[in-house]
Each structure stands twice: as structure tokens, then as C-alpha cells.
């Protein structure tokens, strides 16, 4: 099985989170952007989304991030790495 790619688009209003297996979109979810949330809070949110759609951490082999909210990029990147163990590709990479 091909590992899943976690995708996160950090927008001013929403975070759009998705997972791809090759070119197939497996799920998409949205969270309200909240600049006051911590890395741990975002990690909990990601874990909840994975649980909601029936995916485990070990199924993710990569992470791609786009962002227009630089002050959240680091926290969300670290949260994604903590959950998936995968290195990210995104702003500054």
C-alpha cells in the first residue's frame, strides 16, 4: 500500500486538511484558524481528524503545508510531525 500524504493549507479563516494516496483524495476536513492554539492543541485536532476518518498515524509518510499565516506555520508543522513522524515540505523548505 502507498503511504498517505497529509496536506495542510493554513488560511486566514480555515485550515484545510486532506490526505492523498497517490492522486486519490481520501478525505478533506476543515478547522477554524485560531492563532491562539498551541502545537499540542493542533496535534490533538489532527489526531481527532485521523480517528474520524479511520486512519492511523503510521499510514502517513509525508506532509505538505501551504500557509498565508506565518505565525501558525511552525506550530502546525511541529504538530503534524509529532503525529505522523514525517518531515514536512512547505514554506521555507
Q: What are these model-predicted stretches?
A:
Residues 53-93:
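Short beta-strand-loop/turn "lid" adjacent to the catalytic site in phosphate-handling enzymes
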Residues 2-48:
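Short glycine-rich, Thr/Ser-proximal phosphate-binding strand/loop in the N-terminal lobe
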